[in-house]
Amino acid sequence: MKTLNKLMLSFLLTFAVLQAFSYDFQEGDLRYTIISANPPEVSVSGHANGTSAQGALSIPETVLHDGITYTVTEIGVRAFQYCQALTGDIVIPNSVRRIEQEAFEGCSGFTGTLTLSNQLTYIGESAFLGNNLYPMHLHGNLLLPESLDVIGSQAFLGCSGFTGLLVLPQCSYIGQEAFRSCSGFTGDIVIPTSITHLEDGIFAHCTGFDGTIVLHDNIENIGNGTFRYCSGLTGELVIPESITLIDVMAFYDCESLTGTLNIPSSVVEIGASAFAYCYGFTGELVIPESINEIPHGAFKECVGLTSVVIPNTVTKIGQLPPDCLNKEGAFEGCTGLTGTLQLPENLIRIGGMAFKDCTGLTGELVFPPSLQRIDAEAFKGCTGLTGDLVLPVSVSIIEPDAFRGCTGFSSLQIKNAVSDVNIMRKAFYGCTGMHDIEFTEKVSHIGSNAFAETGWEADQPDGILMLLDWCLGYKGNASNLALQLPETTRGIADCAFTGNTNIKSLSIPDDCPMTKISDSAFYGCNKLAGLLTIPNGIKTIGQSAFERCSKIKNLELAPSVETLDYFAFDYCTGLESITSWAETPPLVKYSFYDVNTDIPLKVPCGTMEAYQNNSQWSAFTNISEVPFKLTVSVDHPDHGTCSIVKHGDCDNPESIVQATPNNGHEFAFWAIDGDIVSYDQTYTFNLEHSTALKAHFDFESVGENDEYAFAVYPNPGKDVLNIRTGLKDAWVEVYDLNGRMIYRQEITENDTAINTTNWSEGTYVWKVFSGVSTGSTTLAETGKWIKE
C-alpha cells in the first residue's frame, strides 16, 4: 500500500509538471493553450525556447492559427518562469485579463518597466516574485489598473526596483506578502475600502514608504507583519474602530510613526511585538478593557510613551510561549515610562522581560493579590523602583533575573505563601539597596546567586551565608575550611559552593530538615577530601552536585537517598569505596562517569541482588553486603550519653543500645523520628533496617523550690511541644522564622503541653520569659524547635 501511494504521488507530480508546460499550438516564439473556442481565447503557455529564451518579449493581443483569430486573455501558470535571458520591458496587452501564478517568477533579465493590461482582473501567486538567486530588476512606477480584483500572495515580492505604487485599486483580495520587500515604493499607503482583511506581510520590508498609512472603517484585521519594517512611514497612526485584531509584528519597527497611539475598544487581541520599536509614539498609552492579555514584545522600546494605563481585565502581561525564539518583553526598554506603575487587580502572570530596563519607573511596586508568577527578567534593570518589595502570598515562581539590578529596593518580603515558592537563578542579583530580606518557610528552592551582590549579602560577616535557614554559600576566603552546615538548614541554593577550592571537609547534620542537595552545590570543590557522608533525610542529590570533586575517597549514602541526578558524582576520580544504606537501589542518572567501577560497593543485608540487577548500579563489579547502619544520639548533650553495646549483623541482627543520664536527669525513652519505640534504658532489638535511635531524657522530679530546671521535648516533634520548667510567674512565646508570634501562653504548671497539630512543618523559635507579674520581664531561655 505504501509503495502504491508513493507511485501515485509521483504520477500526480509528473502530471502536474506536464500540465503546467503543455500547449495546443505554437506561433512565432510563443506557445498557446486554447481556453475557449467560442469566443476563441488562448493562454500564453510559454516561450518556444523555454528558459533559454533570449531578447525582448512581445506578447500580442491576438494570434492567428488555422484560420482562427484567438484573443490572448491569459498568461499561463509558470509561462516564463526563470527565463533569465529575456530583457527589456514587460508589456501585458490590454486583452489579458489574468496573469497566473509564477508566470514571470525569477525573470531577472527584465530591466525595464512593467505595463499591465487595463482589463486585468487577476494576478496570481508569485507572478513577478524575485528572490536572492533570481532578483527582479523591473523599475519605474507600478500602475495597477482599476479593473484588478485579486492580487495573489507574494505577487510582487522582492520587486525592489519599483519606485512608486500609483494606484491600489478596489481589490477584493490582496494576498500575503504581495508587495513584501518592494523597498523602492514611496509616498502614502492607502488601503482600498474594498479590503476588510489585511493579510500577513503585505507591505513588510517596504522601507521606502515615507508618507502616512490610511486605514478605512471597513478593516477588521491587520495581519501578521503587515507593515513590518516600514521604517519610513510617518505621521499619526489612526486605527479605525472596526478593527478587532492587530496581529503579530503588525507595525514592528515602524519607527517613524508619531503621535499618540490610540487603540480602540473594538480591538480584542494584540499580537506579539505588534508595535515593537515604534520609537515615535508619545504620551499616554491606554489599553482598552476589551484586552485580557498583553503579549510579549507588544510595545518593546516604544521609548516615547510616558505612561501606560492597563485595565483590570488584563490577566497576563508579556507571557513568553515555550521555545520562543523572538524573546521580547511587552514593555521592555520603554525608558520614557515614568512614575508609579499601576498593575491591574486581576493580574496572574508577569511575563519574561515585561518591564525590563524601564528605568523611568519610580516609587514602590505594588502587586495585586492575584499574582502567581513573575517570569525571567520581568523587572531587570528597573533602577528607579524604590521602597519595600512585598510579594503577595499567591506568588509561587520568581524566575531567573526577575529583579536583577533593581538597586532601589530597600527590602524584600515573601510572607505567608499559600504554596511552595521557587526563587530561581539571580532573581534578586545586584539589588544593592536591598538590606532586609524576609521570606516564608514555604520557599522550596533557591537558584544560584539569587541574592548575590545585594545589600543583605554585603552586610553579612565572613562565613556561611545563611538566609532564614537557607545556605547560600560562603563569604570570605578561609583556607582548609571544614564546612559544617547548621542543624536548621532547610536547603542549599544551587551552585552555592561551586568552585570553592578552600573546602576540605563537609558535615551535614542528620537532623536538619533539608531533603535535597541542590544542583551544582559543590561542583568543582576539588579540595573536598576523605569521607563524604550524605545524612539521613536527604532524598535527592541534584545534578552535578559533587561533580569534579576529585579528592573524595569514600562516599556514604543514607537510607533515605532515592535519586542521584545527572552527573551527581561525575569525575570523582578519587573514589575508593561507596556505601549505600538504601534498601531500594537509588535511581541513578549517569551519576558516576569516569569513576572506577571496580571499587567496593557496600549495600545492606539482603539487597545485593537488587543492586546487581539495577541497570546503573550493576556497572560496579565489586558489590558486597554489610550490616544495616545503626546510629544513636541524645536529645541534648547536657542531658546524658548513649552508646551501642552490640551491633547486629546480617546473620544475627540482635542489637543492644544503652543510655546513661547525667546528674539531675533521668532516662525517658528511645525514639525513631520522634516516635517512641522503648522505655528501656538498655534496649535490645533486631536490626532489620538502617536505624537512627535517639535517647530522650527528663529532669529528675521538679519541685517548687527548683529555681531553674528546664526541658523542651520531643525535638524534633510532630503534634505536641512539651516545655518543662521550675520557673514560676512565667510565660512562653513561639515564633515562626519570619518573626511572627504564633503562640503565647502563661506557664502555671511544671509541665506545659502545646498542641502543634495544625502547625506547618518547619523550624520555630521558642522563648520563655520570667517576671510576668512584676513587669520586669527577663528572657530566661530560648531555642529552636522543629515540627516534622
What is the meaning of each model-derived region?
Residues 627-633, 696-713:
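Residue-level detector of functionally pivotal "anchor" positions at catalytic/ligand-binding pockets or at interdomain
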Residues 47-49, 657-664, 724-726:
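Acidic, Ser/Thr
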Residues 37-39, 53-74, 84-98, 108-122, ...:
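Structural signature of tandem-repeat unit edges
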Residues 682-691, 753-756:
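Solvent-exposed segments in extracellular or luminal domains encompassing
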Residues 77-78, 100-105, 124-129, 152-157, ...:
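Consensus positions within tandem repeat domains that build extended binding/scaffold surfaces
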Residues 665, 705-713, 717-788:
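C-terminal outer-membrane/trafficking sorting elements
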Residues 653-681:
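Surface-exposed interfaces of beta-sheet-rich extracellular modules
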